[in-house]
Regions:
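Bacterial N-terminal signal peptides
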Residues: 8-17
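Positively charged n-region of N-terminal signal peptides that target proteins for export
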Residues: 1-4
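Short amphipathic alpha-helical "recognition" segments used for binding
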Residues: 6-7, 111
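Lipid interaction determinants
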Residues: 19-142
């Protein structure tokens, strides 16, 4: 059972982080001026093979809120500095509703990626979250 859960988690993580790559320094926008993320809803891009549709939005006064795929997620411990694209979300709170295991796996991996990200890049209507130069996840402006 643990083996199946582990394999499923890896598969879901792979789906969520599809197109993950290390960006070449010459073409990188990482560390450069970025637009504000405030008052915009950002939804995960990709075929999740589940009904889960994780999203986040940011408000200067209330922090981050959204949905991890099943449960509401939120944090007031948010640092977003558009000057260099610095990004940090810590202490994410999660409601605890009963959800299908596939949706819970998506949610767990989504929250882990949000808490791991330390840089962001906005390219047109796409928000890319990075840990260093490694792309973790892409979200679309909704």
């Amino acid at each position: 059972m643990k083996k199946i859960f582990y394999i499923t988690s890896i598969g879901i993580f792979s789906i969520l982080s599809s197109c993950s790559s290390v960006v070449g320094v010459g073409e990188s926008k990482i560390g450069k001026q970025q637009p504000s993320l405030s008052n915009t809803r950002w939804e995960v891009i990709g075929n999740l093979k589940t009904n889960a549709r994780p999203y986040i939005s940011f408000d200067p006064e209330t922090g981050m809120n959204g949905n991890g795929g099943c449960n509401r997620i939120f944090s007031q411990n948010v640092i977003i500095k558009s000057q260099h694209g610095d990004f940090s979300i810590k202490n994410i709170g999660i409601t605890r509703m009963a959800c299908p295991s596939m949706d819970m796996n998506v949610e767990t991996n989504f929250v882990k990626m949000l808490e791991s990200a330390n840089k962001y890049v906005v390219d047109k209507n796409t928000l890319e979250l990075y840990k260093g130069n490694m792309l973790l996840i892409k979200l679309h402006k909704n």
